[in-house]
C-alpha cells in the first residue's frame, strides 16, 4: 500500500527554503569571533567557505545544503565577504563529499547538535500528536516539527523523512479521533447509525432526508425540520460525544460525510463509519436548529410585512370615503359656527346641511373608519394566527431556550405558553409574565377583559426573535445562537494575553492612557477645524447655522483618458472566456488550490473539468446546462468535481493567488499600492427554487433577492466575497478585511452609507483600520464632543447636544478589549458579533460603550472629511472602482436572466465565489495585456502619459466572448512565456486626437 502523502510537491519545495529577507539573511550569516577562529583552522579557502556555510545553515534554519539543495546565493556572498574569500569557491567544496562529512561531524560537536534518530522521531511524533489532533494540514504540522527540532538542537532530516514522520503522526491522530468519537457508543447506538444509511427502493436514505435544506418558508417545513431534529434526538447519542475533538477535525469529517453517498459510507471500516456519522449528525443537528429559528424569523417577518400591506391596501380603499367624511364634518362644523354666531338652533342648523338619520349613519361609518386597525398593522397580525399556531407548540417543545438575567421574564413567558399548549388552555393565566411587553404592544395584549391570547403569543414570539439575535436568550445545540460569552476568548486566556501584551490590537490596553490620547487628538482636531470654519478656509465646505453644505467633487478625469482607453482596449485580443481562464491558470497555477476534500494533495486529473465547473458557477449557467454547452463534459463528471474539489476554502485560496498576481504586476502600482479598498453589496434577483432562499433587503426594494458583498482593492482586485442576508451591509465590512487570504495589507477602507454604524467605526479603530464611509446624509449627522459646544462657535450648529459618555467606556473597557481580541484572533467572526451588538436593547452596557468609541471615531472622521478634500477624492475613487467591478460582475453573471436559482446557501456561496474568481481572472488578464499594449505603443514612439495610465481600468469586457459553446481548444494553447498577438490600431488617428 503506498505511503500516505502529507505534503504536496510545492509544499516540499517551500519547506526548506531560505526567504529573500534582508534581516533574516543578516542574522543567519552572523559569525562571532569564536566561529571565525574555528573556521580559520581549516587551511584551504574552499574548505573555510564551505565550513562557514554549513555552520550558518545548521545554526540558523537547521538543515544542510547539498547537491540537490544549493545554498542561497546571498548567504554564500555574505559569508565570503565576511571571510574575504571568493563566493565561486562553493562548487569546489561541494564536490568533496568526504571533507563535507568530516566538517559536519566537527560542527555537530561544536553546536551540540543531535542527528534525527528513531527514538527522537518517536519523541517528535508524541510532540506533534496534540497538533495533529487539531488539524491534518501537512505544512502546518511540518512547520511545528521543524520548530521542535530546532528547539531541541536536532539536525533536520531530509524532506522524505519529514514526510514519513508527519504521515505517522497524522495516521495516529486519525485513529485517536475515530476512537474518541466512538468510545461511548453502545450497540444500540451503532445499530441506529447504520439504519440511517439504509434506503427502501427508490427512496433516499434516512441520512439524506436528515440533510435536506428547508425549502419554502412556511410552517410545514418548520415541522419537517423539527421531525428531523426529533429523529436525531431519538438516536440517543451520548451528550458531549464530540467535546474532546477539535472543531477543525469535526468539521472536516462532517464535510466528508455530507459529500459521500450512503452506499460509500457503508464501505468504511466500522470505527471510521461511526465516527464520520457522529460528526455528520452533530453538525446536522446544529444546522437544523439554526434553520428552524431562521424559518421562524422569516415567517414572522412575512406575517408582519403582509399585515403592513393589508393595512395600506385597506387605507387606500377607504381613502375616498375618509375624504368625503372630512368634507361632511367641515360642512357640519361651519353650520354650527354660523348657528352660534347668529343665535339659531344648532340642531336645526345640522339638519339644514345633513338629515339627522344620515348624520347618525355618518357617525357610525366614521367610527368604523377610525379603528386603530386601519392605521396600525399590529392590529391585523392576529388574522394569521393559525400560521403561528401550526408550528409554535412543537418548536417550543423541540428547542431548549436558556435566558440571561435581562431576558428572564421573556423566558418565563415562553414557559407559560409552552404550558398552555401542553395543558390545552384557552386563556392566558392572569399571573403570566408581562414585564417584557413593549409599549407598542401593551394595549393590544393587556385588555380590560384580561390578556389577549393571540396577541400575547405573537408578542412573545416576536420578542424571542430579538432576544435570540442579541444573545439574551440562547439555544442549546445551536451554532449561531450560542451563549454570548462562549464566542469570546476564555477570560483567563484573555487576561494572560493582556498581561503578556499579546492582544494584537491597534490601541493601548490601558483605558486611561487610551482615552487621554483620543480626547487630546479630538480636541486638537476640533480646534483646527473650528478655526478653519470661522475663517471660511474649509475647502468646498460651508458650515453655518443651517448646517453643513459640501460642494460635490468636480470630475478629475483628464479629457484624454477616454481616447487613450479606447486606443489601448482596441489593441487587446478578443478571447473566449475559456481561453482567459486557461491562460490565467498557466500564469498563476490557481487551480492547484482546489484540493480533494479527503486528501489535501490530490488534484483533479482533468484540469479542464475543474475550470468548467468554476465557469459554470461564475457565469451562472449551472452544471446541467454547462454539460450541454461544453463538449467532453458530463453532468456527473462536473458534479463529482464540485462535490470533492469545490469548497469555500479552495475558492478563497485560488482567489488569493490571483490577487497576489495582480499585486505583482507593474501596471497595478499606477492604480494603488494595495493598502486601500472598498466594499459594496450587489443584489441579484432570485428565481425558481431560489425564491425560497431569497430575502428582502429594503435597500434594493421589496422583492426578495440574494446579496453578494464584495471587497475590492485599489488595484481593482476583488479579494473577498460573501453571500449576505437582509442585514445591513455594515455587518460584513470587517469580515473581508480580516479573513481574506491574499498578501494585501489594507490600512484604509471605504464604503457607502449602508456600510457604516458606530459599532463598525469602533471595531475598525480597535483593529487598526482607517474607516472612511461616504455618508449620504452627512448634513444630518452630529459631532460628539467631551465638553461645552460654546468652545467651538464655528462648529456649534453641527455639534450634538448629547455629550460623549466616557464613563461607559471606562466601565466596560475590559469587555471591549476581550471582544476585539476575540475577533482579531478568529475566535468569532466580526459579522456575527456586530449583528448581535446591533440587536442588543439600548441599555446593554457593552453595546453602549462600543457606541461611544464609535462616536469618537466618527467625529474624528467627519472633521477630516470637512478639512481634507483629498480624503473625499480617495473615497470617491475607491467606491467608483467597486461600482465598475459590479458592472463587470453583472455582465459575467448573465445566464438564467441573471437570477440565482439555488435554494441552498452552500450553492449560492459557490455562485458568489465563482463569480468573484472569474472577475479577478478577467481583471488580471486585462492588466497583463494592457501592459503589453502600452509597451507596444512605447516601441512605436507614442508618448505615454502616466496620468492617463492611472485612469485606465482593467474591468472592460466588450472584447471578451462570454457566451456560446464553452470549448477548450488544444490547437491554440499558448506555450510557457508566450502571449496572444495584440490587435492593430490606427495610432496616427490617436496622435491627431491627442
Curated annotation (Swiss-Prot):
Q: Which Pfam families match?
A: DDE_Tnp_Tn3, DUF4158
Keyword Oxidoreductase annotated: no
This chain's function reads: Required for transposition of transposon Tn2501.
> By which gene is this protein encoded?
tnpA
- Keywords recorded for this protein, A-Z: DNA recombination, DNA-binding, Transposable element, Transposition
Protein name, per record: Transposase for transposon Tn2501
Which biological processes are named by the entry's GO terms? DNA transposition
Q: What is the lineage of its organism?
A: Bacteria, Pseudomonadati, Pseudomonadota, Gammaproteobacteria, Enterobacterales
Q: Which family does it belong to?
A: Belongs to the transposase 7 family.
Amino acid at each position: 500500500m503506498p505511503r500516505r502523502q502529507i505534503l504536496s510537491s510545492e509544499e516540499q519545495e517551500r519547506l526548506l527554503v531560505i526567504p529573500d529577507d534582508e534581516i533574516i539573511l543578516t542574522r543567519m550569516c552572523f559569525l562571532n569571533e569564536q566561529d571565525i577562529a574555528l573556521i580559520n583552522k581549516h587551511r584551504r579557502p574552499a574548505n573555510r567557505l564551505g565550513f562557514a556555510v554549513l555552520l550558518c545553515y545548521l545554526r540558523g534554519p537547521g538543515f544542510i545544503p547539498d547537491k540537490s539543495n544549493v545554498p542561497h546565493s546571498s548567504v554564500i556572498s555574505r559569508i565570503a565577504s565576511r571571510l574575504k574569500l571568493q563566493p565561486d569557491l562553493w562548487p569546489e567544496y561541494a564536490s568533496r563529499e568526504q571533507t563535507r562529512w568530516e566538517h559536519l561531524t566537527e560542527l555537530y560537536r561544536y553546536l551540540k547538535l543531535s542527528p534525527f534518530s528513531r527514538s527522537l522521531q518517536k519523541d517528535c511524533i508524541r510532540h506533534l500528536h496534540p497538533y495533529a489532533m487539531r488539524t491534518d494540514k501537512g505544512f502546518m504540522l511540518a512547520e511545528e516539527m521543524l520548530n521542535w527540532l530546532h528547539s531541541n538542537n536536532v539536525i533536520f532530516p531530509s524532506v522524505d523523512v519529514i514526510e514519513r514522520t508527519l504521515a505517522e503522526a497524522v495516521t495516529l491522530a486519525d485513529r485517536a479521533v475515530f476512537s474518541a468519537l466512538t468510545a461511548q457508543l453502545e450497540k444500540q447506538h451503532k445499530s441506529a447509525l447504520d439504519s440511517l444509511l439504509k434506503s427502501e427502493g427508490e427512496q433516499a436514505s434516512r441520512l439524506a432526508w436528515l440533510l435536506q435544506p428547508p425549502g419554502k418558508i412556511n410552517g410545514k417545513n418548520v415541522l419537517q425540520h423539527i421531525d428531523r431534529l426529533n429523529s436525531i434526538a431519538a438516536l440517543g447519542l451520548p451528550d458531549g460525544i464530540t467535546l474532546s475533538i477539535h472543531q477543525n477535525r469535526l468539521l472536516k469529517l462532517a464535510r466528508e460525510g455530507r459529500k459521500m453517498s450512503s452506499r460509500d459510507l457503508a464501505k468504511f471500516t466500522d470505527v471510521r463509519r461511526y465516527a464520520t456519522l457522529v460528526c455528520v449528525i452533530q453538525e446536522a443537528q446544529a444546522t437544523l436548529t439554526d434553520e428552524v429559528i431562521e424559518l421562524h424569523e422569516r415567517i414572522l417577518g412575512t406575517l408582519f410585512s403582509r399585515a403592513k400591506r393589508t393595512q395600506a391596501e385597506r387605507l387606500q380603499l377607504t381613502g375616498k370615503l375618509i375624504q368625503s367624511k372630512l368634507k361632511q364634518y367641515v360642512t357640519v362644523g361651519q353650520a354650527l359656527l354660523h348657528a352660534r354666531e347668529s343665535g339659531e338652533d344648532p340642531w336645526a342648523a345640522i339638519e339644514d346641511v345633513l338629515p339627522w338619520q344620515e348624520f347618525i349613519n355618518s357617525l357610525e361609518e366614521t367610527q368604523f373608519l377610525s379603528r386603530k386597525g386601519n392605521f396600525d398593522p399590529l392590529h391585523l397580525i392576529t388574522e394569521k394566527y393559525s400560521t403561528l399556531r401550526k408550528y409554535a407548540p412543537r418548536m417550543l417543545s423541540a428547542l431548549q431556550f436558556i435566558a440571561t438575567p435581562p431576558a428572564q421574564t421573556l423566558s418565563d413567558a415562553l414557559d407559560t405558553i409552552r404550558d398552555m399548549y401542553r395543558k390545552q388552555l384557552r386563556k392566558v393565566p392572569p399571573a403570566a409574565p408581562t414585564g417584557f411587553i413593549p409599549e407598542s404592544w401593551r394595549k393590544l395584549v393587556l385588555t380590560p377583559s384580561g390578556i389577549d391570547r393571540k396577541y400575547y403569543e405573537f408578542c412573545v414570539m416576536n420578542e424571542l426573535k430579538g432576544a435570540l439575535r442579541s444573545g439574551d436568550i440562547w439555544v442549546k445545540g445551536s451554532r449561531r445562537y450560542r451563549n454570548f460569552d462562549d464566542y469570546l476568548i476564555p477570560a483567563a486566556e484573555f487576561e494572560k494575553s493582556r498581561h503578556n501584551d499579546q492582544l494584537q490590537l491597534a490601541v493601548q490596553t490601558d483605558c486611561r492612557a487610551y482615552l487621554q490620547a483620543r480626547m487630546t487628538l479630538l480636541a486638537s482636531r476640533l480646534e483646527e477645524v473650528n478655526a478653519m470654519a470661522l475663517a471660511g478656509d474649509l475647502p468646498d465646505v460651508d458650515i453655518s447655522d443651517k448646517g453643513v453644505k459640501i460642494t460635490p467633487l468636480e470630475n478629475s478625469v483628464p479629457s484624454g483618458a477616454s481616447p487613450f482607453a479606447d486606443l489601448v482596449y482596441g489593441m487587446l485580443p478578443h478571447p473566449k472566456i475559456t481561453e482567459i481562464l486557461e491562460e490565467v491558470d498557466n500564469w498563476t497555477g490557481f487551480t492547484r488550490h482546489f484540493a480533494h476534500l479527503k486528501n489535501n494533495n490530490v488534484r483533479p486529473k482533468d484540469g479542464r473539468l475543474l475550470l468548467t465547473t468554476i465557469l459554470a458557477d461564475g457565469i451562472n449557467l449551472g452544471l446541467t446546462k454547462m454539460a450541454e454547452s461544453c463538449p467532453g463534459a458530463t453532468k456527473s463528471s462536473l458534479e463529482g468535481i464540485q462535490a470533492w474539489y469545490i469548497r469555500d476554502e479552495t475558492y478563497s485560496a485560488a482567489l488569493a493567488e490571483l490577487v497576489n498576481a495582480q499585486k505583482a504586476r507593474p501596471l497595478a502600482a499606477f492604480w494603488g499600492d494595495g493598502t486601500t479598498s472598498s466594499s459594496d453589496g450587489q443584489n441579484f434577483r432570485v428565481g425558481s427554487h431560489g425564491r425560497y432562499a431569497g430575502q428582502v433587503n429594503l435597500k434594493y426594494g421589496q422583492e426578495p433577492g440574494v446579496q453578494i458583498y464584495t471587497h475590492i482593492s485599489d488595484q481593482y482586485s476583488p479579494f473577498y466575497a460573501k453571500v449576505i442576508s437582509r442585514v445591513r451591509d455594515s455587518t460584513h465590512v470587517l469580515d473581508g478585511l480580516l479573513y481574506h487570504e491574499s498578501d494585501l495589507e489594507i490600512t484604509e477602507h471605504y464604503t457607502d452609507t449602508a456600510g457604516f454604524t458606530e459599532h463598525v467605526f469602533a471595531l475598525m479603530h480597535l483593529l487598526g483600520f482607517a474607516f472612511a464611509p461616504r455618508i449620504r446624509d452627512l448634513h444630518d449627522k452630529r459631532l460628539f464632543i467631551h465638553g461645552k459646544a460654546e468652545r467651538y462657535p464655528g462648529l456649534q450648529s453641527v455639534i450634538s447636544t448629547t455629550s460623549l459618555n466616557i464613563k461607559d467606556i471606562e466601565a466596560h473597557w475590559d469587555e471591549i478589549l476581550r471582544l476585539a481580541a476575540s475577533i482579531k484572533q478568529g475566535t468569532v467572526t466580526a459579522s456575527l458579533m456586530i449583528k448581535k451588538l446591533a440587536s442588543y436593547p439600548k441599555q446593554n452596557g457593552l453595546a453602549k460603550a462600543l457606541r461611544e468609541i464609535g462616536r469618537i471615531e466618527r467625529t474624528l472622521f467627519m472633521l477630516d472629511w470637512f478639512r481634507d478634500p483629498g480624503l473625499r477624492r480617495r473615497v470617491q475613487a475607491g467606491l467608483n472602482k467597486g461600482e465598475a467591478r459590479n458592472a463587470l460582475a453583472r455582465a459575467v453573471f448573465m445566464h438564467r436572466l441573471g437570477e440565482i436559482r439555488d435554494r441552498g446557501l452552500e450553492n449560492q456561496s459557490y455562485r458568489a465565489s465563482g463569480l468573484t474568481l472569474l472577475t479577478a481572472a478577467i481583471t488580471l488578464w486585462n492588466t497583463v495585456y494592457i501592459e503589453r499594449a502600452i509597451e507596444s505603443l512605447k516601441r512605436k514612439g507614442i508618448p505615454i502619459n502616466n496620468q492617463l495610465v492611472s485612469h485606465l481600468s482593467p474591468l472592460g469586457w466588450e472584447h471578451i466572448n462570454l457566451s456560446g459553446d464553452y470549448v477548450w481548444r488544444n490547437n491554440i494553447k499558448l506555450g510557457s512565456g508566450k502571449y496572444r498577438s495584440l490587435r492593430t490600431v490606427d495610432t496616427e488617428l490617436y496622435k491627431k486626437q491627442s
